[in-house]
Amino acid sequence: MQLPALQSAKLIRRYKRFLADIELPTGDVMTIHCANTGAMTGCGEKGDTIWYSHSDSQTRKYPHSWELTQLANGQLCCINTHRSNQLVFEALQNKQIKELAMYDEIYPEVKYGEENSRIDFLLKGKGLPDCYVEVKSITLVKGNLGMFPDAVTTRGQKHVRELLAMKKQGHRAVVLFAGLHNGFDRFKIAEYIDPEYDRLLKEAMEQGVEAYAYAGQFEISNEIPTALSLTESVPYIK
């Protein structure tokens, strides 16, 4: 997935969930939009180097968006979780998700379920059961362990219930954890943050719901991040 043209700055603070103040190389201070409403643990500390994009839209109050954080150890994290579906869509198109590579038709944002939900991707293939794929972003990393969620997610809990219902109807149901951080090689659910999500997903997996985690990799050109892609599945620690 190609990233938009990026510029760097230093993070001053994040506030009101959707806003962040940054210091430009010139010393000027600017307010930008933050699309991530999660806790962003470890990915948004004062003084961090961040990368932001610019939009030409005339309707936006804040034309710049926080895209990536560069951590002190040099690792990168895409904090704009709106990018995750585009990342997975390209991986599905390119048959990079080996567990789903047999499907040829990809339908994004399809209404389904009993709780007024939209599935991120509905996959179809000749002679195959329909496959419902819910995408979750991995931005929380400790050591080399990627985790989800970084905050209690009642929405995520709902999605697990919906996926289990699809599985009981004879379809495939998959949670795909996509690496937006390039610092992990293993994955587990952060049960200490959301024990209910952990419980629901474990119960759903016992009944046939599938879960996979894929690592992310950034491309760098002239010291500027230019692209992000999913590379390979990593061990899922239950």
Curated annotation (Swiss-Prot):
Which branch of life, at top level?
A: Bacteria
Q: Which Pfam families does the UniProt entry name for this protein? A: SfsA, SfsA_N
Q: Which InterPro entries match?
A: SfsA, SfsA_C, SfsA_N
**What CDD domains does this protein's entry cite?**
SfsA-like_bacterial
What GO MF terms are annotated? DNA binding
State the family named in the UniProt similarity comment for this chain.
Answer: Belongs to the SfsA family.
NCBIfam families for this protein: sfsA (TIGR00230)
Query: What is the official name of this protein in its record?
Result: Sugar fermentation stimulation protein homolog
Origin organism is Haemophilus influenzae (strain PittGG)
Q: Name the gene that codes for it.
A: sfsA
